[in-house]
Amino acid sequence: MIHSSYHHKDTYEDSKTSSVFETMLMLPDELFWGVLRTACFDNENLPVVAGRIEDYEFWPHWDPTHTTNSTLVEPDVFIRFQSFDVIIEAKYSDRPGQYYQQWKNEIIAYSNEYGSDKPLYFIAVGGNAEKMTESVSAIKDIAITKCTWLSILIQITKLRNEYEGLSTISNNQSSTIRLLNLIELVFNIHGVYNIRWFDEIRISKPLISPDSMMTLKTFFK
């Protein structure tokens, strides 16, 4: 939570946003974007290739002209890739908290700062009442793509498992595994866990019968 401390942000939401994304941004650029894109529920509008991350900023202060804000507009995370820009608006939990006017204000304020030189994508993390993509008409139509904290963690876990399953692990891959473990720990600290089913855990001897596992799963449908 380096960035939340630097910006004097002391809410649970700000600490979670800072801790998760500042560690995720340590991943190689293509892995970071791959995780974030795949975590989104309806990601067909998001490019597969992003290119290099040129810059990023937590809680930038943008010009509020033509918005409903009076002093500034402050998205949570702003990332400039080679090919496009991304606004990330994050909410602490999955209880409804995202709302149209905030999205619209951030898109207008982005246009005030950067014009329309690059394509803009908007990702709403957490706080979504529905999973399907919405559209905001502000300067131009922008799709609001959605995900949850858990859907991001699931992709982090999958990627880590893929690396650990390699027959030979390079030094770079080893450091990536350590970073993915750290990111998972950050999620856990903030109350987000990826539950692993019993039949996915590698053990030498079965601890529970297959019938019992199927019975347990029925309680979590």
Give the residues covered by each predicted segment.
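Charged, terminal alpha-helix-loop-beta segments
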Residues: 1-221
